[in-house]
Amino acid sequence: MQAPFPKNSANLTHLDGQGQAQMVDVSDKAQTIRQAVAAAQVRMLPATLEAIQAGNTPKGDVLATARLAGIMAAKQTANLIPLCHPLPLQKVAVEITPDPQLPGYQIQATVKTKAETGVEMEALTAVSIAALTLYDMAKALEKSMQIESIRLVSKTGGKSGDYFPPAP
């Protein structure tokens, strides 16, 4: 059974005239500098945080592996999310910072391109996969870790302008 076609679909660029999903044609758009920042957090027991910080983990360097996984994931976004355009990425930076107050880690990804469309999904994919990899690398220490608050922190450039949501 097909979902009902939205009545206000005239402005929904990912739907064709019959309400079917389509990849948006961006060929007429100008290439501009675009940047997006996304964040996530991984909550864990204080002992797990301490073990990761000390390098006492069975799988090796948790943070380096998670950071690289996030970078690699940003580059694969168009292969993972059906209607995303493959984009040339000029920058992907993933930062993973310990947060003893959480306790756990704060993850932030910054992605930059010069293209016809934005890199929000690339930044969100980067933090998501970095968080999943951190979990995978440390699950032998704790299976109750929680991945939380995956969100867009900011985006700049493009037709829709800059976006800075209120703090959570």
From Swiss-Prot:
The keyword Manganese does not apply. It holds the Pfam family MoaC. Signal peptide: none annotated. Pathway: Cofactor biosynthesis; molybdopterin biosynthesis. Gene3D superfamilies: Molybdopterin cofactor biosynthesis C (MoaC) domain. Its EC number is 4.6.1.17. The active site is at D136. One of its GO terms (biological process) is Mo-molybdopterin cofactor biosynthetic process. InterPro entries: MoaC, MoaC_bact/euk, MoaC_sf, MoCo_biosynth_MoaA/MoaC, Mopterin_CF_biosynth-C_dom. One of its GO terms (molecular function) is cyclic pyranopterin monophosphate synthase activity. Keywords: Lyase, Molybdenum cofactor biosynthesis. Substrate binds at L83, C84, H85, M121, E122. CDD domains: MoaC_PE. It catalyses: (8S)-3',8-cyclo-7,8-dihydroguanosine 5'-triphosphate = cyclic pyranopterin phosphate + diphosphate. Belongs to the MoaC family. Homohexamer; trimer of dimers. Catalyzes the conversion of (8S)-3',8-cyclo-7,8-dihydroguanosine 5'-triphosphate to cyclic pyranopterin monophosphate (cPMP). This is Cyclic pyranopterin monophosphate synthase. It comes from Nostoc sp. (strain PCC 7120 / SAG 25.82 / UTEX 2576).
